[in-house]
Amino acid sequence: MEYRIERDTLGEIKVPADKLWAAQTQRSKENFPIGTEQMPLEIVKAFAILKKSAALSNQKLGKLSEEKAEAIVEAADEVIAGKWNEHFPLVVWQTGSGTQSNMNVNEVIANRGNQILKEKGSDVHIHPNDDVNMSQSSNDTFPTALHVACVIAVENHVLPAITKLKETLVEKVTAFEHIIKIGRTHLQDATPLTLGQEISGWHRMLEKTERMIAESNTYMKELAIGGTAVGTGINAHPKFGEMVSEEISQFTGKQFVSAPNKFHALTSHDEVVYTHGALKALAADLMKIANDVRWLASGPRSGLGEIIIPANEPGSSIMPGKVNPTQSEALTMVVAQVMGNDATIGFAASQGNFELNVFKPVIAYNFLQSAHLLADAIVSFNDNCAVGIEADEEVINENVNRSLMLVTALNPHIGYENAAKIAKHAHKEGLTLKEAALQSGLLTEEQFDEIVDPKKMIAPKE
């Protein structure tokens, strides 16, 4: 491998000749050989959006020449397009402010910008600190990139995935609204409801958590940029934060604003905790839905077997003909990961000391992992399971007819204690509920048939 010599304030260091990064990136690469978790490319691209917006703002403020600004913007656009992904090699486990990743972006954009200028015959030189990082600090750029990346992940991936599954569930609610099944509480038989009603509960969960996520995400649209090192805005124009936020908004189509208090924006990540908490709420509901699906599909002959799920792949390497609820299993594993990520984010966000929190990279990594896992898992569950759910009406009807909990309808007519005696007698003697009721002498066959009608038990009545 061929190398070139780069220099920084610590001296000279060898850098691979074909890479756009420079000394500080190389030092980080050598000093932190920890794990395989790379800084998410979403953070890199959010940084590039920020650097582009900063260059345009500094140009408008008369602090950066038009020639340099144009080269920085062009280089940043290439980074955003993914042209230089291999030039961002750093891992998450680095300085807690994300300084090395900020410098990685500064160095790549500066070197690529200089190539662009050279191709145009210019001898102007872009410096990674003085030009690309002008009016900025790692302390305000990393939280800005973090918020931009997380907002995009939530709005472009998580929320559309929820909408897709919601639409499928609405179709199932309508398709199954006539199918009366036995309800279950504590994993025990309860009073009846329709399969459509049961699924409507799932739909409402998604509808509610979707709104919770969207509402919490508004706080993530406050950006730290303009606070520089400790929140005072030293070395930045007073309007810089506002101008950059407007540029980022125009480029992303998201309504970002300059954070009203930069001291808070650098040392606290409560917005991330709040939004990820909403993602955790979604995850909790998805766990419930996935579990319901696999319970209801259990069988085929020794389980509940009230719904049929698509047979996507052989279920066992030893038991032929087995169909497992694999989409539910994948989704519940994602939920477990999200729950763990939430614990990490909550702890990391509690570690702000004085003017800075230095757990930023791990917060970014875990949030983005949660967002993408949830989005992918929801779409997979929808496409490979939910859309193909069918009701086994024969099994459902059999379970309803065998249930002793229909006795609940007798409570207003013969009292709770008498109804309980009938249910216990039926269970002990192996009788149907009707047979036990008639043996009690408390009501006639006509009265029983009139009262114990599942169709009359699925909604309130006067």
Curated annotation (Swiss-Prot):
Site location (Important for catalytic activity): E329
EC number: 4.2.1.2
GO biological process entries: fumarate metabolic process; malate metabolic process; tricarboxylic acid cycle
GO cellular component term, pick one: cytoplasm
Keyword Oxidoreductase listed: no
Chief site of localization: cytoplasm
Active site: H186 (proton donor/acceptor), S316
UniProt GO molecular function: fumarate hydratase activity
Catalytic activity: (S)-malate = fumarate + H2O
Coiled coil: none
Metabolic or biological pathway: Carbohydrate metabolism; tricarboxylic acid cycle; (S)-malate from fumarate: step 1/1
UniProt-listed InterPro entries: Fum_hydII, Fumarase/histidase_N, Fumarase_C_C, Fumarate_lyase_CS, Fumarate_lyase_fam, Fumarate_lyase_N, L-Aspartase-like
Complexes and interactors: Homotetramer.
Further details from the record: There are 2 substrate-binding sites: the catalytic A site, and the non-catalytic B site that may play a role in the transfer of substrate or product between the active site and the solvent. Alternatively, the B site may bind allosteric effectors.
Family (UniProt): Belongs to the class-II fumarase/aspartase family. Fumarase subfamily.
Function description: Involved in the TCA cycle. Catalyzes the stereospecific interconversion of fumarate to L-malate.
Protein name: Fumarate hydratase class II
Species of origin: Bacillus cereus (strain ATCC 14579 / DSM 31 / CCUG 7414 / JCM 2152 / NBRC 15305 / NCIMB 9373 / NCTC 2599 / NRRL B-3711)
Organism taxonomic ancestry: Bacteria, Bacillati, Bacillota, Bacilli, Bacillales
GN (gene name): fumC
